[in-house]
Amino acid sequence: MTSETSVNLLDFDAEGLVAYCGSLGEKPFRAKQLQRWIHQYNAGDFDGMTDLAKSLREKLKGRASIVMPDIASDHVSTDGTRKWLIDVGNGNAVETVFIPEETRGTLCVSSQAGCAVNCRFCSTGKQGFSRNLSTAEIIGQLRMAEFALRASLGRAPGPNGKAERVVTNVVMMGMGEPLLNYSAVVPAMRLMLDDNAYGLSRRRVTLSTSGVVPMMDRLGAELPVALAVSLHAPNDALRDELVPLNKKYPLRELMAACQRYLKVAPRDFITFEYCMLDGVNDTEAHARELLAVTRDVPCKFNLIPFNPFPESGLIRSKPEQIKRFAQVLIDAGVVTTVRKTRGDDIDAACGQLAGAVKDRTRLAERTGAAGKIIEVRAV
């Protein structure tokens, strides 16, 4: 544990670290050195930072720390998907998932413990909202995953270029609504993009939002990365039921915001995510309606087979119905993919493991036991 006055350096992007070093009487280049040690060499303390002046290392030892999130469990699926459960205190946990593919490795990162948006089909929303994650807790997920994966492959830490990097893409699609934690998410994404940290391109960092229109505009002005929008319905009446935020920012406003974002986006399309729910939003008529509502937004569709959980009362669309729905979109000339289900054997659907932790914690509170996260592993 660190002292109450200790500063966690993982909370700083480049600008913040320069300012912090300045407060110690140090020049800006020291911040770059420090950032490389932390994010490229995986340094956990200051003694090994040999190109820093000893006087600076001593200053840092008394004032700063590098504190990573605590890993509660680490699960590896038979298909190679790897999922970490991160303990963020007070019985709360978030999830980080790595999805390996032949030409890339994608890390799905969480931004909040729980979620206040409360989409009907999302198990995270049913847990309620606990708190925003800090920048350190967000970028810490990438730092933890990158170096754990490198170690498993026998690759040493260090800025060894793209050939050595395991995580090639980051998607802010884990637990929480990223744009409702803007002040912590944006510095974390700046570190993802920084050549003195993880060096990802803007095209390889994707933020997924349920449609917080004012913050979409702000993101476009300040840090336009690739954008995905959780759409899930082709009209306001249905989307009001599935995504309650739609009552505040209806489809007309959302589509206009998407058009504005595309003027500055690193990609020339928006990805619309669409959870396929049997008998709710999956008819061919819904698909045609979807084409109409998105007609002025260059886009592609990512159809997501629903991951059932007991409280939802919803059922996954049948494979043949998903295929028919997709064909309507494809026939209209829109690129459409169906998300492949990954990591079923380790509950890799977002929110499932953390939801189990939440349930155990609530049970412990009722029975008077300590609310400690219990490690569980796939067998």
Swiss-Prot record:
InterPro entries: Aldolase_TIM, Methyltransferase_A, RlmN_N, RNA_MTrfase_RlmN, rRNA_lsu_MTrfase_RlmN/Cfr, rSAM. Its EC number is 2.1.1.192. One of its GO terms (biological process) is rRNA base methylation. S-adenosyl-L-methionine binds at G176, E177, S208, S230, L231, H232, N307. Keywords: 4Fe-4S, Cytoplasm, Disulfide bond, Iron, Iron-sulfur, Metal-binding, Methyltransferase, rRNA processing, S-adenosyl-L-methionine, Transferase, tRNA processing. Reaction proceeds by a ping-pong mechanism involving intermediate methylation of a conserved cysteine residue. This is Dual-specificity RNA methyltransferase RlmN.
